[in-house]
A protein has these predicted regions:
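Amphipathic alpha-helical dimerization/coiled-coil segments
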Residues: 2-14, 91-107
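N-terminal helix-turn-helix DNA-binding core of bacterial DNA-binding proteins
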Residues: 16-55
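Basic amphipathic alpha-helical segments that dock to polyanions
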Residues: 45, 59-66
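A short, conserved structural fragment
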Residues: 64-74
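Basic, amphipathic "hinge/linker" alpha-helix immediately C-terminal to the N-terminal HTH DNA-binding motif
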Residues: 76-92
Length: 107
């Protein structure tokens, strides 16, 4: 009986460590929103969203295709910044996120 409860606890705790893809996208949008008009480099997004460099690039490409983020190059870096559509989406996402949290649901 004790082993079953311990196994269940481990399963629940291990599930809580991971974010959904929407949660990750929300974190990236949050970082790019805070980056302002100058944009944010990949390493800053990686650090603030707690993602690998390659995961950031992969998710940012999806956000670019959806029109939520845009990219620009300056002298040395590729920078990402949130679009108007991205800002609108992010506001709705935060509202949805707050609703789920108020209902004790994970997204």
């Amino acid at each position: 009986m004790f082993l079953i409860k311990l196994e269940l606890l481990y399963h629940i705790m291990s599930k809580q460590q991971y974010r959904s893809e929407m949660g990750i996208m929300g974190d990236i949008l949050d970082v790019t929103q805070n980056g302002g008009q100058q944009g944010v480099i990949v390493s800053a997004i990686s650090r603030r969203a707690n993602l690998s460099h390659y995961a950031v690039l992969d998710k940012c490409e999806k956000l670019i295709k959806a029109g939520l983020v845009e990219t620009k190059r300056d002298d040395r870096n590729r920078k990402f910044r949130i679009t108007e559509k991205g800002l609108d989406f992010f506001q709705e996402f935060k509202t949805f996120q707050n609703l789920l949290e108020s209902m004790n649901l994970r997204y």
